[in-house]
């Protein structure tokens, strides 16, 4: 598999020089996930986020929601792995540009993850909107072509129906909590308001296939 090379900031290069977990081909928690594997994704999460952290709880909740969706629709393990790893760009070892979708996809690419996975992580939940706000939309599209609409929509659905603490919520509740957390002038709040109509349509369409999330 070809490996992308790109300049790293000094701080990021230093962080990545510290030995860390590998998703493919090296032991993690006593396992060696040599292919796309939701169990390996969960093991990586547990190494990169502190126990009890909101980001860990949210990622686990999104992963479990994806497992439910995959059972109903017959979706592949790729969806579940991407769901567990979708916010890995918030981990200290991965943070670089501030666009967590791009940072997470780059980090996973460096671990040898396949482009099918990195593309989902890179583009989940209307990433191109925030990327444009940050001047990173060109880099995002060049490095990670947008993946299949079906899996990307399902991943985004799982994210938008899971709270910051990993609980199942409605899309109304999800937006309400996002806007409570970020003031109107914040980049995240602005990006989500721009993306909100599309995200609501996406969630509504998938809920017609699945039914509303469990409460």
Region locations from a protein language model:
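Divalent metal-dependent phosphate-bond-processing catalytic cores, especially two-metal-ion Mg2+/Mn2+ enzymes
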Residues: 2-36, 47-74, 85, 110-113, ...
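Short, basic/glycine-rich phosphate-binding loops at helix/coil junctions
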Residues: 38-44
């Amino acid at each position: 598999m070809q490996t992308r090379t790109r300049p790293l900031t000094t701080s990021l290069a230093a962080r990545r020089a510290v030995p860390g977990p590998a998703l493919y081909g090296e032991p993690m928690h006593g396992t060696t996930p040599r292919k796309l594997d939701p169990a390996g994704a969960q093991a990586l999460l547990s190494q990169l986020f502190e126990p009890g952290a909101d980001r860990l709880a949210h990622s686990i909740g999104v992963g479990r929601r994806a497992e439910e969706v995959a059972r109903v629709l017959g979706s592949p393990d790729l969806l579940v792995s991407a769901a567990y790893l979708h916010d890995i760009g918030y981990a200290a070892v991965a943070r670089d540009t501030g666009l967590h979708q791009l940072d997470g996809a780059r980090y996973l690419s460096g671990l040898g993850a396949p482009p099918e996975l990195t593309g989902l992580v890179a583009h989940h939940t209307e990433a191109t909107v925030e990327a444009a706000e940050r001047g990173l939309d060109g880099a995002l599209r060049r490095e990670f072509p947008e993946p299949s609409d079906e899996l990307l929509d399902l991943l985004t659905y799982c994210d938008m129906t899971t709270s910051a603490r990993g609980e199942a919520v409605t899309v109304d509740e999800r937006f309400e909590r996002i806007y409570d957390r970020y003031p109107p002038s914040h980049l995240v709040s602005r990006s989500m308001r721009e993306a909100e109509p599309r995200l609501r349509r996406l969630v509504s369409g998938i809920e017609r296939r699945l039914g509303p999330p469990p409460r």
